């Protein structure tokens, strides 16, 4: 159960941070399958596959915006060319996080999300400080996934919109 909670938290991070940037006219992502390679500290890389169409991308963005507005006491966003910077202070139940995120890329073929965050109240298994890089690349048409579905390592399929509901999205 603890692993599922961490996965849901990571799913929220994948969706909510780009969604928060939507407030400064972030372009829609290209429909199809996206590969998300998550790198965090010395942990092995985690690769996730995400299938999007126009409707699921919009719904995920709206869900992420809902989480941001409901769970974050402060969000500051700036854009300079193709670089978007987001600073946020958010609370998810007993967990509070402060994060600094830099997003670069075109959202049609690739983008990168680099986040530095500090977490309190997450229990002994949650990292207190983390630096995460998500390298996101478009790989083509969806292969075995429906729009809005995410394939986690080990073959676990998650409907991203359903996963966001417990977090307020």
Label for each model-derived stretch:
Residues 1-6:
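Positively charged n-region of N-terminal signal peptides that target proteins for export
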Residues 22-169:
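Subset-of-secretome marker
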